[in-house]
Amino acid sequence: MNPKDIRNIAIIAHVDHGKTTLVDKLLQQSGTLDRKDIGSERIMDSNDQEKERGITILAKNTAIRWKDHKINIVDTPGHADFGGEVERVLSMVDSVLLLVDAVDGPMPQTRFVTEKAFEQGLNPILVINKIDRPGARPDWVLDQVFDLFDRLGGNDEQMDFPVIYASALNGVAGNELEDIKEDMAPLLDLVLKEVSPPDVDTEKPFQMQISALDSNSYVGVIGVGRITCGKLKPNDQVIVIDVKEDQRKGKILQVMSHDGLERVEVEEAEAGDIVCITGIENLYISDTLCDPEKVEALPPLSVDEPTVSMTFQVNDSPFAGQDGKFVTSRNIKERLEQELLSNVALRVEPGESSDKFKVSGRGELHLSVLIESMRRDGFELGVSKPEVIQKEVDGEIHEPFEQIVIDLEEEHQGSIMEEMGLRKAELKNMQPDGKGRIKLEFIAPSRGMIGFRSHFLTLTSGSGILTSVFDHYGPAKKGEVTNRQNGVLVSMTSGKTLSYSLFNLQNRGKLFVGHGLDIYKGQIVGLHSRDNDLPVNPTKAKQLTNVRASGTDENLILTHHIEHSIEQALEFIEDDELVEVTPSAIRLRKKSFTF
């Protein structure tokens, strides 16, 4: 295909502003979908966790044909925790579609991804989505985006961006608010008009950089990337250059191009197209493939440094090995090494002992998604409290800071301001919307924000919205940051929980276990209503006596116990506690069983 007929774009947006839905509609509009796929929602989010959480974790590629052109589209994650994915993707495209919600306007994570796009010199197209929402205010959003681009230092070309109004859910778009067409055609036409075709030379020797990896058991590793120059055919001999500039020979088996959601084998691919290749073992992200005649490496892709670390260790609780398939340190090590191949923002180092691993990532969500996928694969492990990664700069300790945006009802403002003060946050901006809600912007040290989310929901009675994104490394704030105020209820025996004893423990705090569960000594069974830890016995039965009771036993009614997701459990625990993760349970426990 002639490079002049190709357009490469990435879709970027804050989480939940409708990227993946937009891609669905573009696929349907262009007639690229199979009949069986029509009607299913968010087709791009193919992995189980993505469907459940309603977020995109992995960047994915698809391609649509429109008016004899091929548009390669990459759907990127909106969470800053998956920023490693975003940066690699932007190296493959020539422009970005910035999708912004018509009510919310640009959010912190919109800023994060847009900044990356501007650094690469990409020109944006603004799509104001969800214009059918009640309270939509597209003109205000347009002003906000303009201000954002200005703050990010956009050049004249980037500031003069085209705008299109759309409702991806209804599949309609238009160049003017008053002139919305019946379908997505205006958006596709705008992409052909505004996005420049790849600036490449097909006559030069072949060269491409791997910016994503995939694998299947049949062909092994699949490398995805954009051909920088030249042409590529199956069975071509190439030289692979890794990040350390070591060279080795390789042979390409298949060359596949994208068509809709399918990968289609092609006889030849030209510069400017995004392709998948197979046949080369041990490929890594950032590797350069080139023609043996002219060996030249492309500059390696940069990825942000991790900011949070936690220890993964072998599960050593009394219930170890009861419901997991993979329980040894060797199993955990192999799984983490396999994850490192495709998860570029992850780091794994040996821990204090041979059965512990220090795993670092971009944030709590990044690591909890990894733990959840290991748990589903049948792993058992113990995980420690997340810690922030500090650096030393010119003899001074620096720690990561986050930009926090909080949207809440005015009545909760006082308690949140007080709480953020205890966490060493600085208020940067405050915007009332005139309808009883207020938007607060803070810069806060990351260590103060660990464990804040669940507390925040309690303080705002579930009505607050909190979004955070990594901002910078700066000199560490002095003093301790506030942590959990209450102690915990710790079981002092092993056995089955009984409703008689749980009923009596309810006055002592909130319970984490229900009736009839197996527990062990040292397991945390509840949150104490005071600030000290309390050993309790949830297995105690009612003493039977031979004296007839007047009337009957009272009917014991237990209030519903609290169940934690992995993120909530990681936020809850303190330094002397662990989260035990197995395929069927998430338990909290003390590190030592003697107390």
Predicted segments with their positions:
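P-loop NTPase switch module centered on the Walker A-proximal segment
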Residues: M1-V100, D104, Q144, L213-N216
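Conserved short loop/turn motifs at secondary-structure junctions
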Residues: A10-I11, V127-G135, V172, E176-I180, ...
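Residue-level signature of catalytic and energy-coupling elements of molecular machines
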Residues: D16, L22, G54, D75, ...
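Switch/connector loops and helix/strand junctions flanking conserved nucleotide-binding motifs
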Residues: R35, M107-P108, R133-D139, G171-E176, ...
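Conserved P-loop NTPase nucleotide-binding/switch module
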Residues: V86-V100, G105-F149
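Canonical P-loop GTPase G-domain recognition
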Residues: N123, R133-K193
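Accessory interaction regions appended to the cores of large information-processing enzymes
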Residues: P162, D189-K193, P197, G223-F595
